[in-house]
Amino acid sequence: MEDLADVICRALGIPLIDIDDQAIMLDDDVLIYIEKEGDSINLLCPFCALPENINDLIYALSLNYSEKICLATDDEGGNLIARLDLTGINEFEDVYVNTEYYISRVRWLKDEFARRMKGY
């Protein structure tokens, strides 16, 4: 099987990239990083600044879309990120389906938290 990062790029319909040097920008609103550590591979996307309101933070961290997607803070603690764990997923169709679902969730999160931060 080809490199999983190459499969992710194909699934997203973007040119192959050097994942050590670049992030992936989709539609000028979603920035995705591919993180490889040993045999594991994750997609990371910061989707909003860390909420100041504790209820918004609790809400964000309580969301759970699947066993593969989790929400957390970044290493610096300034942003909420969505992480997709693709470890152990080897078939192109499975990578594609999981990646597409992840992108749809990230877009929803960005919209949801933009509204919450404005008090809607």
From Swiss-Prot:
Stated consequence of mutating residue 95 to I: In plasmid pINV_F6_M1382
Gene Ontology CC terms: cytoplasm
Function summary: Molecular chaperone required for IpgD stabilization and secretion.
Family stated for the protein in its record: Belongs to the IpgE/SigE chaperone family.
Name of the encoding gene: ipgE
Predominant subcellular localization, coarse grouping: cytoplasm
Location in the cell: Cytoplasm
Name of a matching Pfam family: Chaperone_III
UniProtKB keywords: Chaperone, Cytoplasm, Plasmid, Virulence
SUPFAM superfamilies, sorted: Type III secretory system chaperone-like
Stated name of the protein: Chaperone protein IpgE
Effect of residue 79 to S: In plasmid pINV_F6_M1382
Xref: InterPro entries: T3SS_chaperone
Coiled coil regions, renumbered to chain: none
